Design a protein with these regions (language model features):
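Core catalytic alpha/beta fold that binds nucleotide/phospho-ligands
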Residues: 1-152
Length: 152
């Protein structure tokens, strides 16, 4: 059963966390179906309602995954923070004003840019230097050393 780590008041957008995804029973399709079941169960549907239009996006890192479901276009990213050559990577992918060797700043920027790019439905490599012009929601209730953002 996935854990809800974000939901709007009207349940039009929800983010589900899956842990221990390296176990055999945690495959991508099963996780997505479980998130859809939970999301659809909370939607206000009557006998006369049209089929629910679900936009979704998922991300995984280390042994964790999130699936975001929404009635609107959505992008999500999570990253497990670990030591890397941050300055070298940020020089390659980020705008020159965003170059950093700080792990938390690097992963915050990376997750924001990846969530935004997924929301735009574009290639990540082509969009890491762009300025984000949408509100981003930091995901809370994530495991230690995991950072994540949602773009709606």
């Amino acid at each position: 059963m996935p854990q809800v780590i974000f939901e709007t008041e009207d349940w039009s957008t929800m983010v589900f966390l899956f842990t221990n995804i390296n176990e055999p029973n945690h495959n991508g399709k099963a996780m997505t179906r479980a998130a859809f079941r939970e999301y659809i169960a909370r939607q206000n549907v009557t006998d006369c309602s049209k089929p629910i239009n679900v936009h979704w996006n998922k991300s995984d890192t280390h042994t964790f995954a999130v699936v975001a479901c929404s009635s609107e276009k959505i992008g999500v990213d999570i990253e497990y923070m670990k030591k890397r050559p941050f300055e070298k990577i940020s020089r390659r992918y980020f705008h020159e004003h965003e170059v950093t060797d700080d792990m938390e700043i690097f992963f915050d920027l990376w997750c924001q840019k990846e969530a935004y790019t997924k929301w735009k439905k574009e290639r990540i490599a082509e969009n890491m230097r762009v300025k984000i012009d949408r509100p981003l929601i930091p995901l809370e209730n994530l495991p230690d050393n995991v950072v994540g953002y949602l773009c709606t």
